[in-house]
């Protein structure tokens, strides 16, 4: 009798164990808010379902992905049954989420692809409990709903973990780099990152593709894996500037970020976006530090005040105090935004407001650059006391060996760099989102400020240049007014005109080529001959729109680098043709490009940028020497529109569509087509025109308003 009872007990125990294993093999459906009394009813319903045929089970539940989830959940349940039970009981009894530190025990590869709903109410409490308990994460059936939620991950994390004000201010104070150093390190790192990305994609393209395991092999590998909690995946390497010697930190390296657990929740693209916004804030802090040094160390120096006349000091330092005040307020607002939450909500709304209302001080400062440079050179030449004092101040350890002139150009460098930083943010925000609209508006305002700065500089120098040219010209034909507010010089130089072989009475052959001098303005061509006294005698002219050029095929050394210039209507209202010879191939192409800018180039026409034309990135800075040349900054990306055999490239810079010539030795070519395509895609996104949908969205929202409740 006792033996039969023991056998019955053993069968009952085996049956319960078998039912438990079957339950473990199914996706977790037990909600954390269920009471212990309800678990028996749920278990009984599960037993009935196990006996019924499985004809209505969705296909998703039997996928490779969900089989791996069930297998890992089963392994964790075997290893830590007591811990799971205690965590579940605590969360049910106390009604609190175990996930206080925002650390979700969901592998990054198992998370929804883009958006996750995490609300700060009772519903969010339930989801937090289920996700914080190992093995009881959101079921695969729930993930599509989470992914389709309109609440973005950044909005969900808003106001969860603010950064203490003292901690953030200490970080700002610890930035040991002056802006000149910060900017150089950042651009050099950008170049190196592109090189690495180019090499990685080339390796993936040329090498063997990654091995794809069959479902059977994948199951065998996972069965052999030891039962262990999900491992933390390596964080994406955004850049390599976290050098301990440079004191240049990344957002993801902040102690508050590491301890909060948000790096386990955010997607890699969102982390890159956070890094882009963080760089804008920290670079502004570095810029403010350098600008403050210009004022305190140089401008307010008592000896400099005694040496310089007030008018000289005004030209030299301009309105730098106004620029410093704007930078201080701008940085303060960025600091407040950082203190609100460890996950930065946005910074482009602040940038937009300041660009629209306060950055006009940059236009005033930069427009004075021509007079500032001239005054500085004159002071160095004429006042020895000033020259010696500046050299002495530059040796101070505060200046880090940087020259005084590098501090004077800080505002122009900053306003240009700020536009590029907003572009980096714009490339990483989600498309058709509010943050994209805000970034586009901020970029548009900054672009207007930068253009106004450039026009201010050019206007000052162009006016003086036009007056100087007008004084040197003597007209053999009807006089043409040169000075105009809408006219500026594009190119000037000497060419040789082919006049044809002629024989004089003494049977001596005259010269085949005669020197002429061309002044090409944006709307006018003036053809001259140089005469003694540094004067130019004008003998022909034509509107620039009535010029045509044609390149001759190489017909030997004599006719090398020869092209035909045709004036459809010259000063005498008739057509004229000139056969001109340049000193080199690059000089010939540069003249042809300037004279007729709408002709087709070697790689792509000027009316189309859709072709996969070659690209280069600048690895050495270059300052334009002539009006048709392009000044290059480190890390600039350019489309190659034309190039010559003697080492010159005619290109278009992607971030502002400026075109010009530059030496090929200043750049290196981007060989990978995927990188080139990505660069063009980002360029089109940054410069896309406002569509009707975006215009409607812009009317509905108010810039700068944040929902922080």
Swiss-Prot record:
Comp. bias regions, Basic residues: 699-709
Gene3D superfamilies: Dbl homology (DH) domain, Pleckstrin-homology domain (PH domain)/Phosphotyrosine-binding domain (PTB), SH3 Domains
Disulphide linkage map: none
Changes after translation: Src-dependent phosphorylation at Tyr-179 upon EPHA4 activation increases the guanine exchange factor activity toward RHOA. Phosphorylation by CDK5 upon EPHA4 activation by EFNA1 may regulate dendritic spine morphogenesis.
Domain PH, residue spans: 488-600
UniProt remark on domains: The DH domain and the PH domain are both required to mediate interaction with EPHA4.
Name the record gives this protein: Ephexin-1
Organism: Pongo abelii
Organism ancestry: Eukaryota, Metazoa, Chordata, Craniata, Vertebrata
């Amino acid at each position: 009798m006792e033996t039969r009872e023991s056998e019955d007990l053993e069968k009952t125990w085996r049956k319960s164990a078998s039912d438990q294993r079957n339950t473990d093999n199914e996706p977790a459906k037990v909600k954390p808010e269920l009471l212990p009394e309800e678990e028996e009813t749920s278990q009984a319903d599960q037993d009935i379902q196990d006996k019924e045929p499985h004809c209505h089970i969705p296909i998703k539940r039997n996928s490779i992905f969900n089989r791996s989830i069930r297998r890992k959940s089963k392994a964790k349940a075997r290893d830590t049954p007591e811990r799971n039970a205690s965590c579940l009981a605590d969360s049910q009894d106390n009604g609190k989420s175990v996930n206080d530190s925002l650390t979700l025990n969901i592998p990054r590869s198992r998370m929804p692809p883009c958006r996750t709903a995490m609300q700060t109410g009772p519903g969010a409490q339930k989801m937090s409990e289920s996700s914080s308990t190992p093995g009881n994460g959101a079921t695969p059936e729930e993930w599509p709903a989470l992914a389709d939620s309109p609440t973005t991950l950044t909005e969900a994390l808003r106001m969860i973990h603010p950064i203490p004000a003292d901690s953030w201010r200490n970080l700002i104070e610890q930035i040991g780099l002056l802006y000149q150093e910060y900017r150089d390190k950042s651009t050099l790192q950008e170049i190196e990152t592109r090189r690495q990305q180019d090499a990685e994609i080339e390796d993936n393209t040329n090498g063997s593709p990654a091995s794809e395991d069959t479902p059977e092999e994948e199951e065998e590998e996972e069965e052999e894996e030891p039962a262990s909690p999900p491992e933390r995946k390596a964080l994406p390497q955004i850049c390599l500037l976290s050098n301990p010697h440079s004191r240049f930190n990344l957002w993801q390296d902040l102690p508050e970020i590491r301890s909060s657990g948000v790096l386990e929740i955010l997607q890699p693209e969102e982390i890159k976006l956070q890094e882009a916004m963080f760089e804008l804030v920290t670079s502004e802090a570095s810029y403010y530090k350098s600008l403050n040094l210009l004022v305190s160390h140089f401008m307010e120096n008592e000896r400099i005040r005694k040496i310089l006349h007030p008018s000289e000091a005004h030209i030299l330092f301009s309105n730098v105090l106004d620029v410093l005040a704007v930078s201080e307020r701008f940085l303060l607002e960025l600091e407040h935004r950082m203190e609100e939450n460890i996950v930065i909500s946005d910074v482009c709304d602040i940038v937009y407001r300041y660009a629209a209302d306060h950055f006009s001080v940059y236009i005033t400062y930069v427009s004075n650059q021509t007079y500032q440079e001239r005054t500085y050179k004159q002071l160095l030449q004429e006042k020895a006391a000033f020259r010696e004092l500046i050299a002495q101040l530059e040796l101070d350890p505060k200046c880090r060996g940087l020259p005084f002139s590098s501090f004077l150009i800080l505002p122009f460098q900053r306003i240009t760099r700020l536009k590029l930083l907003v572009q980096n943010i714009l490339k990483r925000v989600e498309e058709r989102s509010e943050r994209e609209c805000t970034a586009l508006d901020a970029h548009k305002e900054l672009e207007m400020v930068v253009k106004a700065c450039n026009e201010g500089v050019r206007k000052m120098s162009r006016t003086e240049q036009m007056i100087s040219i007008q004084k040197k010209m003597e007209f053999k034909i009807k006089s043409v007014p040169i000075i105009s507010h809408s006219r500026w010089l594009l190119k000037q130089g000497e060419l040789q005109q082919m006049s044809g072989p002629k024989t004089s009475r003494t049977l001596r052959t005259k010269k085949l080529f005669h020197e002429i001098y061309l002044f090409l303005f944006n709307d006018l061509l003036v053809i001259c001959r140089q005469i003694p006294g540094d004067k130019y005698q004008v003998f022909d002219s034509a509107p620039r729109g009535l010029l045509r050029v044609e390149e001759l095929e190489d017909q030997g050394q004599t006719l090398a680098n020869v092209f035909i210039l045709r004036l459809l209507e010259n000063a005498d209202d008739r057509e004229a043709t000139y056969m001109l010879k340049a000193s080199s191939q690059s000089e010939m192409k540069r003249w042809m490009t300037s004279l007729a800018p709408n002709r087709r180039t070697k790689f792509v026409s000027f009316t189309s940028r859709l072709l996969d034309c070659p690209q280069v990135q600048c690895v050495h800075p270059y300052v334009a020497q002539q009006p048709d040349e392009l000044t290059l900054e480190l890390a600039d990306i350019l489309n190659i529109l034309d190039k010559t055999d003697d080492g010159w490239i005619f290109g278009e810079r992607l971030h502002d569509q400026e075109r010009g010539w530059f030496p090929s030795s200043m750049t290196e070519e981007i060989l990978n087509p995927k990188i080139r395509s990505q660069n063009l895609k980002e360029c089109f996104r940054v410069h896309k025109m406002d569509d009707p949908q975006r215009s409607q969205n812009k009317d509905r929202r108010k810039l700068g308003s944040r929902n922080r409740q």
